């Protein structure tokens, strides 16, 4: 008799060992399920230390009452005025080391050839707090520009009053780094112009009048206190308390 055919057996697949630490969790794709809408999580970000300090300082200056002498530093020139001012100041930036080397080499070669070398004192921006203070006291400065974010503020807090006393036009601009860039430094507390070229005298006069109107002769700037703004939570508490008092008064009036 013929033998019965052998049963075809499928080879058993080796079961993969599953790690018990990783468990399958089915996701719900409904509204408000596992996939949440994007939210602004700025408040919960762990910022770098220096940014945290910047944020805390900003909030503190809003909460506390800030004296006018410090608060006036927040009243900077607007974007249009400051851009025009920086264009003028950039044309009087001191020479860079490479430019100085090139100039000295050219002078040395001219001297070697027996040519007469003319050396005129260049008209450049003045910087350095002590130097600017001396220029203001001697009434040599025609225009003074002060950075609004000097830290500690005590370094320059006397400059505005000194400028008013000596009738020197001054203004606050955003960024000690921007002023530093003009004089080839990382930062600068203030810069000053003592003289300008003939073609820029009209611009200097224009800026002098603007600064005197907005800063030197502006008495509100010297009297206005800053800060004293409550936070969102405190504002809600004050409103709730005022509402409760109002309701209590209405009840008493009805009695």
Swiss-Prot record:
Domain of life: Eukaryota
Any single Pfam family the record assigns to this protein: Ribosomal_L7Ae
One of the record's GO molecular function terms: RNA binding
Cited PROSITE patterns: RIBOSOMAL_L7AE (PS01082)
Keywords carried by this UniProt record: Ribonucleoprotein, Ribosomal protein
Biased composition (Basic residues): 1-16
Disordered: annotated segments: 1-28
Any one Gene Ontology BP term: ribosome biogenesis
Keyword Protein biosynthesis set for record: no
Cellular component GO terms held in the UniProt record: ribonucleoprotein complex; ribosome
Family: Belongs to the eukaryotic ribosomal protein eL8 family.
PANTHER family xrefs: RIBOSOMAL PROTEIN L7AE FAMILY MEMBER
Name the record gives this protein: Large ribosomal subunit protein eL8
Organism of provenance: Tetrahymena thermophila
Phylogenetic lineage: Eukaryota, Sar, Alveolata, Ciliophora, Intramacronucleata
Name of the encoding gene: RPL7A
């Amino acid at each position: 008799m013929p033998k019965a055919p052998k049963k075809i057996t499928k080879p058993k697949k080796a079961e993969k060992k599953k790690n018990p630490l990783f468990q399958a969790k089915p996701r719900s794709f409904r509204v408000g399920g596992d996939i949440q809408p994007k939210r602004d999580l700025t408040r919960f970000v762990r910022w770098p230390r220096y940014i945290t300090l910047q944020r805390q300082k900003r909030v503190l200056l809003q909460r506390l009452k800030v004296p006018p002498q410090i608060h006036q530093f927040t009243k900077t020139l607007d974007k249009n005025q400051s851009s025009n001012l920086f264009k003028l100041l950039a044309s009087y930036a001191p020479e860079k080391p490479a430019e100085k080397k090139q100039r000295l080499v050219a002078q040395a070669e001219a001297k070697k050839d027996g040519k007469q070398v003319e050396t005129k004192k260049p008209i450049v921006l003045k910087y350095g707090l002590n130097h600017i203070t001396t220029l203001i006291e001697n009434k040599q400065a025609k225009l003074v520009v002060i950075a609004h974010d000097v830290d500690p503020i005590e370094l320059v807090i006397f400059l505005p009053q000194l400028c008013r006393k000596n009738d020197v036009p001054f203004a606050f601009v955003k960024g000690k780094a921007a002023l530093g860039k003009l004089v080839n430094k990382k930062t600068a507390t203030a810069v000053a112009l003592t003289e300008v070229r003939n073609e820029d005298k009209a611009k200097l006069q224009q800026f002098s009048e603007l600064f005197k109107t907005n800063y030197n002769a502006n008495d509100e700037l010297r009297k206005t206190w800053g800060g004293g703004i409550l936070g969102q939570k405190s504002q809600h508490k004050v409103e709730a308390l005022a509402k409760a008092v109002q309701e209590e008064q209405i009840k008493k009036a009805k009695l």
